[in-house]
Amino acid sequence: MESIYLGNCWTPFNWIYAIYDVLVKILSIREIFQILSLMYLLFLYIGFLLISKFDISLSLAFFFPCVFWICWAKIKNETWDIPNRKNRLVPLIFTLIYLSILAIFWKNIFIIIFLVNVLVILIITKFWKISMHNYGLSAMAYLIYAFTNSIWLSTIYLILVIITGYARIYLKKHTVSQVIAGTILGISVNYILLNLI
């Protein structure tokens, strides 16, 4: 593929295209999508920091569930995203219990929001496999807008929702309906939640 640069002018588009150009030459599309899927947790963590005005202590709410999830995936001999729906239940229950304990001793709105979202995902996962990637990123897109009023940051997250959703379908990790359901629920659950709090 030949690079298309806008003359000698290095616009943001040219930087993005140049990075894409290099990635395509080094990696396959599948590998790029796998990297994007792995970056999901980083995007969620950055989102958490944005909505909490960079409250680093919230790392506690995020760190231990992630470690448990990865360890559980190893125990079950699965990839880190645990594609088997039933194997997702134990780490989700652990996260729910852990966040409940944190919420009792540390009454923080973001812990409560995280807790409710994990509960919703757990209930759905008991019966059906939903895209947690798209649920988490779309929830974060809405929460960033609700707490920061930043349309451009929310737009970045919505773009990530689209790219990640496509990647999950391309990698055959989810069906289209699972990705769409995750996206719609991520936004709607948090919209309802913030209107109730």
From Swiss-Prot:
Q: What is its main location?
A: membrane
Q: Which residues form a coiled coil?
A: none
User: Gene Ontology cellular component?
Assistant: plasma membrane
CDD domains found in the cross-reference section: PAP2_like
From the Swiss-Prot or TrEMBL record, state where the protein is found: Cell membrane
Question: In terms of domain of life, where is this protein from?
Answer: Archaea
Its record classes its membrane topology as: Multi-pass membrane protein
Record-given protein name: Uncharacterized protein MJ0611.1
